[in-house]
């Protein structure tokens, strides 16, 4: 009987190994989901003031001081894609008080970097003093850019 038990031992060991469940294969390596790059939202880059612009709508000679009869240009650089609504609010500034001089809005579909212009003129002459132009983007209550300038 002892010999039979000893003879069965190796067979049982082999049988046990054959019945052993194999481990599941490792999961396939994960791949990162493809990233979708959204185009940048419209934004205001720079605002340059001057009394003349070129065909590219850029101010030819930047200035922050103007004569009483000057036409004052604000060249506004934008970037990004999508619908853009730019509003220029020109104001006379005296201490803490401001008085609106002019307000102009333009709308366009932006396909990338662009330059737009706003301007104000007063043929009878600007009163001497401090002024500012605020550029608003897409109905935001906060100006995207503000530039101050003097007349006189």
What are these regions (language model features)?
Residues 18-22:
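Bacterial signal peptide processing site
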Residues 29-37:
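Extracellular mucin-like PTS domains
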Residues 1-17:
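Sec-dependent bacterial lipoprotein signal peptides
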Residues 23-27:
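Ser/Thr/Pro/Gly-rich low-complexity linker/stalk segments immediately outside membranes or between
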Residues 1, 28, 93-97:
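Serine/threonine-rich low-complexity intrinsically disordered regions
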């Amino acid at each position: 009987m002892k010999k039979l038990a000893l003879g069965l031992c190796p067979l049982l060991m082999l049988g046990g190994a054959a019945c052993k469940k194999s481990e599941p294969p490792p999961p396939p390596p994960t791949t990162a989901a493809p990233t979708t790059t959204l185009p940048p939202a419209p934004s205001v880059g720079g605002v340059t003031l001057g009394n003349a612009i070129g065909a590219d709508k850029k101010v030819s000679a930047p200035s922050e001081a103007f004569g009483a009869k000057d036409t004052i240009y604000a060249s506004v650089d934008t970037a990004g894609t999508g619908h853009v609504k730019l509003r220029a609010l020109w104001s006379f500034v005296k201490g803490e008080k401001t008085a609106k001089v002019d307000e102009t809005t333009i709308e366009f579909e932006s396909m990338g970097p662009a330059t737009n212009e706003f301007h104000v003129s007063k043929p009878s002459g600007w009163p001497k003093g401090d002024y500012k132009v605020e550029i608003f983007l897409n109905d935001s209550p906060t100006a995207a850019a503000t530039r101050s300038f003097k007349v006189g």
